[in-house]
Amino acid sequence: LGKLVPHGLKNASRDPATLEAWWRSCPRGGVGILPGPEVLVLDFDDPEAWEGLRQEHPALEAAPRQRTPKGGRHVFLRLPEGVRLSASVRAIPGVDLRGMGRAYVVAAPTRLKDGRTYTWEAPLTPPEELPPVPQALLLKLLPPPPPPRPSWGAVGTASPKRLQALLQAYAAQV
């Protein structure tokens, strides 16, 4: 469908008539899904990463997921309200973060030129029916807290002589 959406997500549509026209025009086109901001898609490029995380978080097995042509997985989960993750987070080797209203996912029944396909292993559900991201997994994906800020004393707690000495010391370094 690249020729139908030359600007990618900017040309995306949810309009049934538009989608129907695209399918008539290009019946072998691929499918892309842009999940909303409340949907996290774990993109496992490495089948071993999927197996490891699935064993660590058995709840992932109940999530809607598809198998990719290279043997990876796309696992669809619901983020807690107000939680924002960065797609650039690389907290888990072999796993990319997609969806979240910012990154699309190629989806079944897309077929590659070599004949390999995307296939659903567990069917996709509406966002409100997706299982939540397991808490322990979410903690791995959240950015680290900012470093503590230095706590300065309240105004008026340093003597004028101390402030003058600090200013002179800083001025001498400049």
Tell me the role of every PLM-derived stretch.
Residues 169-172:
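A mid-sequence, solvent-exposed acidic-amphipathic segment
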